[in-house]
Amino acid sequence: MPNLSCYTMQVPIQHMYKLSHEGSGLLYAWFLSMHTRVDIILYSKKTEGELLFVVNYIYDALCRLEKMANFYNPASELAYVNRTAFVSPVVLSEELYSMIDLCLEYNGKTLGCFDITVHSENYNQNTIQSVHLSAEDHSIYFSRPGVAVNLSGFLKGYALETIKSILNECVIENALINMGNSSVLALGNHPVGTGWKVNNILLHN
C-alpha cells in the first residue's frame, strides 16, 4: 500500500469531515457502487487527507470487484465466462477462481439453498453440477449450454471482507460501513459511545 498522504477525493465520492476537541477526526463519505449507496464513517486520529486516502482505497477496490464479477456488466470478467465457458475452458483470475470455488462450497454446505446458477437457462437444482473448476490451471468449464454464474448474492459480503482488510491495513480501528442497508460492517466504537448502534429492535404483541 502507498504511504498515507493528502489525497484528492475522486469525483464520484462526497464527504464531510469534523475534528473533535480531543484531536480525533470523524470522516463521513458516501458514493454509489454495486448498484447501491455505500456510506462510510471513519473515526481516527489520522488527518483528513489520510482518511480520504482510505476512502479512495476502498472505492478503487469496489470498482475492481465490479469490473471482475458484475453479472450485469458485459465487459466484466464474469460476463466473459458466462459467454464462453461452454465453448471451451476459461482460465480465471486468481481472485475470481477463489470466489466461485467458495460459492460452490457454500452450495454444498447449504444443501443447495445458495446457488450461483439460478439465472441459467432452464435452471433446476442440478444446474450447478454443470459448473466445473480445475484446480490445476484455475479454469472453469460449463458442461451444458445456457449455464450462467451470478455472484450478486455473494459479492457485497465479499466486498465487506475486502474493506475490512483495507481498514486493518490502514490501521483504522473505528469504522462503520453500510452498503444499501443490507450489508453492514462495524469496527471498534462510535465517537460518543461503545460499539455502533445500528438499529432499534421494536417488539410488538
Residue ranges, per PLM feature:
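Mature catalytic core of soluble alpha/beta enzymes
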Residues: 1-205
